[in-house]
Amino acid sequence: MGDQPCASGRSTLPPGNAREAKPPKKRCLLAPRWDYPEGTPNGGSTTLPSAPPPASAGLKSHPPPPEK
């Protein structure tokens, strides 16, 4: 009878923890936005990484037309 509870995995964390450890890992994959907002569909990439490049190109492209 003592083996049954252990085999159930309810008292033991190995079986239960192993299955619960997988879900948290999936959350980490969705939480990468904070890790690297560069490839975030939230627009974070356009806020820091994309912002600098476009801003420089925009400033250089704008001056030419006004000059004419």
UniProtKB/Swiss-Prot annotation:
InterPro entries associated with the record: NoBody
Result of altering P32A: No effect on interaction with EDC4
A cellular component annotation (GO) from this entry: P-body
Protein name in the entry: Negative regulator of P-body association
Known outcome of mutating P41A: No effect on interaction with EDC4
Compartments (UniProt record): Cytoplasm, P-body
Consequence when changing K22A: No effect on interaction with EDC4
Species name: Homo sapiens (Human)
Ranges for region Disordered: 1-68
Superkingdom assignment: Eukaryota
